[in-house]
Amino acid sequence: EFDWRNFNFNTKVRDQGDCGSCWAITVAGALEGQAYWYNRKNIELSPQELVDCSRKDHGCGGGWFESAFEYVANKPDQWLAPESKYSYLNRQQECDANARRSNTCDFSDQPDLYKLKCTGSRQLPYDNEDALKEALIIHGPVPVAIHVTPDLYMYSSGVYTDRTCVKTAL
C-alpha cells in the first residue's frame, strides 16, 4: 500500500489566511512534491509568485491550476522562486520582476533541482479514482479541488462530509 507519509516528504502546511490563494498554494505544493519525488529533497516554493504574477489568474480572488502551471511552464527557467526569496504575504501585490527572469531559482545548495522543469499539466479524467492513484504513484502529489459550502467553515476534525455536495467537475 502506497503512503506518502513513508517518504519523509515534509514541507510546511500553509495557511492561506484571508487571501483566496488555495490554487497557488496547491500548485506550489504539487511542484514541491514532484521535486521531492524526483530528487528526494524537501524544498519550499513560492505560492506568492503565482498570486502576484500569474496574469490569467486573479490573485487573492482565486485562480486555476491549469493557468498556474502554464505560468510556470512559460517562465524562462520553468520553475517557481523559492519561498525564502519570495515569501507568502496573505495579500496580492505587484509582481516582483525578478521572479519573471531566468535563474530566479537559487537552489545553489541543491544543484540537482536546476534539472527540474515544469513543462505543463494535464487534467485527469473526472471521477476516476484509479487515474488519480496512478498519477500519485508515478508523478507525486497532484492538485485537487473541492467546492466549498458554508458547512466547511464549521468543520473542526475528522472526515468532512457535505450532504449538499453535488458530484460535478469544478
Regions inferred by a protein language model and the residue ranges of each:
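Catalytic-core signature of thiol
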Residues: E1-L170
